[in-house]
Curated annotation (Swiss-Prot):
Keyword vocabulary terms for this entry: Cell inner membrane, Cell membrane, Lipid biosynthesis, Lipid metabolism, Membrane, Phospholipid biosynthesis, Phospholipid metabolism, Transferase, Transmembrane, Transmembrane helix
Membrane topology annotation: Multi-pass membrane protein
Source organism (scientific name): Shewanella oneidensis (strain ATCC 700550 / JCM 31522 / CIP 106686 / LMG 19005 / NCIMB 14063 / MR-1)
Record note on quaternary structure: Probably interacts with PlsX.
Pathway(s) of this molecule: Lipid metabolism; phospholipid metabolism
The protein's name: Glycerol-3-phosphate acyltransferase
Annotated transmembrane regions: 6-26, 82-102, 118-138, 141-161
Root EC class: transferase
Compartments (UniProt record): Cell inner membrane
Family matches, as InterPro entries: G3P_acylTferase_PlsY (IPR003811)
Keyword Lipid metabolism: yes
Amino acid sequence: MSQLSLTLLMIVAAYLAGSVSSAVLVCRMRGLPDPRSQGSGNPGATNVLRIGGASSAAMVLFFDMLKGALPTYLAYLMGIDAISLGLIAIAACLGHIYPVFFGFKGGKGVATAFGAMAPIGDDLAICLMASWVVLVLISRYSSLAAIITALLAPLYTWWLDDRFTIPVAMLSTLIIIRHKDNIKRLLKGEESKVSRKRRPKIP
């Protein structure tokens, strides 16, 4: 199989993998409301945290990151070039954002994008996760943390392994574009802060 054919095959596979909505499936499995119609309406880990608690959100985060990491890392093992790896990672994110299996109504693609970046190295994964966590703790805005971390990601990559700076910049651009409405709400002071759903106390 030619390099072009292999790349196209992996792009399709990545999109289909990304189209599996972890948030919707985890909520169904746990008897929670559909995240597309509750909370912020975004089927992602942050909204699942709001409506279902930390354990459900952690499951969604793990599987959303896995959707980005697996196809990208497999493509890397196949010897696919860096720019094509970026396209494959973007395909996984587009699957998450516009999932063919769930009516093309998906999430922001942040966890999937960070998952696609993670195989570059443990040091990059730690930098990304630490940046996001610290920014959320300081600001209480998941969207702001995602935007700033996306802006930092190409700089981290250039510093740690500059071969993948362009693919990471491609993913960062997608994340920022996807957050355009959040940016408008942040500027207006209307963005929702992160808060975990409080369960009723048992008498």
